[in-house]
Design a protein with these regions (language model features):
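Single conserved hydrophobic/aromatic residue that forms the stacking wall/gate
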Residues: 218-238
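Glycine-rich phosphate-binding loops of nucleotide-dependent enzymes
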Residues: 1-217, 221
Length: 238
């Protein structure tokens, strides 16, 4: 299987803190790859580097086999990478449609082509099982529905590599089930997914591969049995 994303020896330092030390991982195309570790281990930092929000102090990033150095999220988005943040970045007083197309509005005759946007959003919603009402104000949506809007935002921009940063932190159990169903659907459509979490039970439910980060260092990125992973994490915590 081809490799969608490869990080080689990524390091990142802040004043007095080593956030990432020699972190490497490979994400296969069409898989869910979990990035696991305790709070403060450096999981989100390495993904912010991949997304262009921060620059690494060392290491290489390869996307679909091509070495890339992202200077901003715009460059990462252009390369087909999207990030669903833990804290949603939505305008409450805008509709679902307006939020999804914001900054990437289709135009016709120098005006926003809302008809074309609506058609595209409805098609994506059905294709990926992310049903939304394009005309509903975001302020009227529940947390799980808002997350769907965030996912559709990155898909609308052409992402085929999706980063989910602690996506279940604000969800109730039913919404977690719905999210995992959506993740499986995205994977079946060939999307590559990076799932950041510190919740082991959720990782075992959704992930095909796992990379463990402890105290800023990557300890394993190979495909392994779920039982092996559980034992390893439990032993290292003692």
């Amino acid at each position: 299987m081809s490799i969608a994303v490869e990080l080689r020896h990524i390091s990142k330092r802040f004043p007095g803190v080593v956030a990432n030390k020699d972190v490497s991982l490979k994400v296969e195309t069409g898989s869910v790859h979990a990035l696991v570790g305790e709070n403060g281990a450096g999981k989100s930092t390495v993904m912010k580097i991949l997304y262009g929000m921060q620059r690494p102090d060392g290491g290489e990033i390869l996307v679909n086999g091509k070495q890339i150095s992202f200077k901003s999220p715009y460059e990462s988005i252009a390369a087909g990478i999207g990030m669903v943040h833990q804290h949603f970045m939505l305008a409450d007083n805008f509709t679902v449609l307006e939020n999804i197309i914001l900054g990437d509005e289709p135009t016709h005759a120098r005006q926003i082509d809302f008809k074309a946007a609506r058609i595209k959003i409805n098609e994506m919603s059905k294709l990926y099982g992310l049903e939304v009402d394009p005309d509903e104000l975001v302020e009227n949506l529940g947390v799980g529905q808002r997350q769907r809007v965030e996912i559709l935002k990155v898909l609308y921009r052409g992402a085929n590599i999706l980063i989910f940063d602690e996506p279940t932190a604000v969800l109730v159990p039913q919404e977690v089930d719905e999210l995992f169903s959506a993740l499986h659907g995205l994977r079946e459509k060939g999307m590559s997914i990076i799932f950041i979490s510190h919740k082991l039970d959720e990782v075992l439910r959704v992930a095909d591969e796992v990379t463990v980060i402890r105290r800023s260092e990557e300890h394993t990125s190979e495909l392994q049995s779920r039982l092996h992973l559980v034992c390893r994490l439990l032993l290292e915590k003692k």
